[in-house]
Amino acid sequence: MEFKFIETNGITLRAAVEGEGPLVIMVHGCPESWFSWRRQIPVIAEAGYKVVAIDVRGYGGSDKPYAVEEYTIKKISDDLIGVIDFFGEDQAILFGHDWGGPIVWYTSLLNEDRISAVAGLSVPYFPQREFSPLDAFETIYEGKFFYQLYFQEEGVAEAEFEPNLRKYLEATYFSIDARGMKKQFENPLNAMDKGSDAKYLDGVIEFDDYPNWINKDEMNYLINEFETSGMRGPLNRYRAQRKDFEDLKNYKDQKLKQPA
């Protein structure tokens, strides 16, 4: 595996690259990096593909524009098309996880001739509707804490997370794995059910040991990545959702045509 720095859409992305064959681009979510795909990269490369796992703009070794509007689905979609062009290919297969899911779904919708197949983990494809997801969240979670609404005011979540990266990353990762979900079901009055004036880390589930799917050295790598990049870029993706709604409103109810 090697790192390449790819100039695309006016910025530079860092990508982990391995293998030869049809192009597969892997897109991580939040809070993650190319490193999330570390176990899948060699397997897919060995199966006969060129695997390119990017750091999404705002993360890791990639450029980090400041403005919220630089983090729309449309902007990041154009980044991916530039990656395909960089490798001299006409098409690519896309994999996405978490925020990478909507990114690859809509890249496929907006660029039907450039994406041959697409797969997403954890976030399904949601066609555009008559309202922004943030409007729905404001109604559903009125008077309660919801992380995506908490992330909307610039600087607030950054001020909480950046001095506490280990706690933030461990809490985010561990609270939604099997052990964390079990604890949440055992105690309904948990960190997922708190007032709208709460902070993200208030009442989070913590564990003394690591689960079997990540070790401390791997977590330290991720912490170092976020110490370098900061949290503004990752959080701006959440803030860009109203602009996404405006950009994509003409695609209401459209289905993907690629194998998915």
Enumerate the predicted regions with their spans.
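Conserved Rossmann-like nucleotide-binding pocket used by diverse enzymes
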Residues: 4, 26, 52, 95, ...
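Flexible "cap/lid" subdomain of the alpha/beta-hydrolase fold that forms the substrate-access gate
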Residues: 59-63, 68-95, 99-260
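N-terminal cap/lid segment of alpha/beta-hydrolase-fold proteins
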Residues: 1-12
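Residue-level detector of flexible, active-site-proximal loop/helix-junction positions
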Residues: 10, 22, 125
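Short, flexible hinge/linker loops that cap or flank conserved catalytic cores
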Residues: 7-9, 17-19, 254-256
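Generic structural signal for short, solvent-exposed loop/turn connectors between secondary structure elements
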Residues: 1-3, 19-21, 129-134
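Conserved HGGG/HGGXW glycine-rich cap/lid loop of the alpha/beta-hydrolase fold
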Residues: 14-63, 83
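Active-site donor-binding loop signature of nucleotide-sugar glycosyltransferases
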Residues: 8, 56, 123
